[in-house]
Amino acid sequence: MAVSESQLKKMVSKYKYRDLTVRETVNVITLYKDLKPVLDSYVFNDGSSRELMNLTGTIPVPYRGNTYNIPICLWLLDTYPYNPPICFVKPTSSMTIKTGKHVDANGKIYLPYLHEWKHPQSDLLGLIQVMIVVFGDEPPVFSRPISASYPPYQATGPPNTSYMPGMPGGISPYPSGYPPNPSGYPGCPYPPGGPYPATTSSQYPSQPPVTTVGPSRDGTISEDTIRASLISAVSDKLRWRMKEEMDRAQAELNALKRTEEDLKKGHQKLEEMVTRLDQEVAEVDKNIELLKKKDEELSSALEKMENQSENNDIDEVIIPTAPLYKQILNLYAEENAIEDTIFYLGEALRRGVIDLDVFLKHVRLLSRKQFQLRALMQKARKTAGLSDLY
């Protein structure tokens, strides 16, 4: 039964980026029907636990012309997608984890895609596609061999010395204190049946056969054989644990190097900003000093002019730079004086101070003179290269 979007939102209701998580989950379960969202308790390495959603099921992986259903479990942290998911291979009872550079003995998956995870360039669909490619080159699980009893010893034939998949029959690759399937991570339920056929070697890639020490003449396994097998299993486990820690340390070192580079770049940018600010402060101080100096000069000039204002002729305050400009100024002043005179004559006529004949006589004379002044001023402005005023 497909999980609805409302059910997904309820599962990730405590997630910081709920909508992004739901959108990516819907895209994944739409494309990979065998992956199902499950809400479960995840136990961290420090012993703390948290309710998280995981995608558990199988993904199709092509290997040597056949397609195998590889069981995985993807735990989504509550800060997803800004933190990568925690990924595991989850073998069934008929499978065994094949440790390698991408999968440790606990089934945890290590990929460069996870170490370099960066939203929005990284997402669940891209992660699953990378897993399919990587697992197609190096399968993370192989089918567990069928246990076979040893035949009775015959004096005329050699003992049976070849077994699959590389361990003496009936001997676990772990000491008695370890379970066959380590459980350092939370369990994820898987659908039974079809996707994982029983134990035939054609359903999952098998490891090549190796030669081991055979049973003793009485049909039992000697203590030396058991001891050697246990030592080999423990050595392999320690070797892969050490490689896991080294890879993790290398990943942290690479992350620290990138952080150091970012800090150096940031430090350089800050130094450039400080230098630029110092230059701007120096320029502002220089402009302030210049403004103070000009203000003092203006204050001194104003004080000097105020002291001399009683002896100054108002007509001599404005002195044009050329005689032509002085002529234009005088013509303009005289023309405006005539304009004011005509205005006040009109006011006198309106109030009855003068009669109409006197008004018309003076207005006629003033208008004629005003016309002559305007014509002369237009000619002077044209000679001076100025625009027309009327």
From Swiss-Prot:
Query: Belongs to which family?
Result: Belongs to the ubiquitin-conjugating enzyme family. UEV subfamily.
Protein name in the entry: Tumor susceptibility gene 101 protein
Major location (coarse): cytoplasm
Enumerate the spans annotated as UEV domain: 2-145
Coiled coil start-end: 235-316
| GO cellular component terms given for this protein | centrosome; cytoplasm; cytosol; early endosome; early endosome membrane; endosome; endosome membrane; ESCRT I complex
Tissue specificity annotation: Heart, brain, placenta, lung, liver, skeletal, kidney and pancreas.
- Residues covered by region (Disordered): 198-220
**What Pfam families does the entry give?**
UEV (PF05743), Vps23_core (PF09454)
PTM info: Monoubiquitinated at multiple sites by LRSAM1 and by MGRN1. Ubiquitination inactivates it, possibly by regulating its shuttling between an active membrane-bound protein and an inactive soluble form. Ubiquitination by MGRN1 requires the presence of UBE2D1.
| Gene (UniProt) | TSG101
Q: What is known of its domains?
A: The UEV domain is required for the interaction of the complex with ubiquitin. It also mediates the interaction with PTAP/PSAP motifs of HIV-1 P6 protein and human spumaretrovirus Gag protein. The coiled coil domain may interact with stathmin.
Residue ranges, annotated region (Interaction with CEP55): 158-162
* Known role: Component of the ESCRT-I complex, a regulator of vesicular trafficking process. Binds to ubiquitinated cargo proteins and is required for the sorting of endocytic ubiquitinated cargos into multivesicular bodies (MVBs). Mediates the association between the ESCRT-0 and ESCRT-I complex. Required for completion of cytokinesis; the function requires CEP55. May be involved in cell growth and differentiation. Acts as a negative growth regulator. Involved in the budding of many viruses through an interaction with viral proteins that contain a late-budding motif P-[ST]-A-P.
As for membrane topology, the entry says:
Peripheral membrane protein
N-acetylalanine modifications at: 2
Which residues fall in a compositionally biased region of kind Polar residues?
A: 198-214
SUPFAM superfamilies in the cross-refs: Endosomal sorting complex assembly domain, UBC-like
Impact of altering residue 63 to A?
A: Reduces interaction with HIV-1 p6; impairs HIV-1 budding
Q: Enumerate the GO terms in the molecular function aspect.
A: calcium-dependent protein binding; DNA binding; protein homodimerization activity; protein-containing complex binding; transcription corepressor activity; ubiquitin binding; ubiquitin protein ligase binding; virion binding
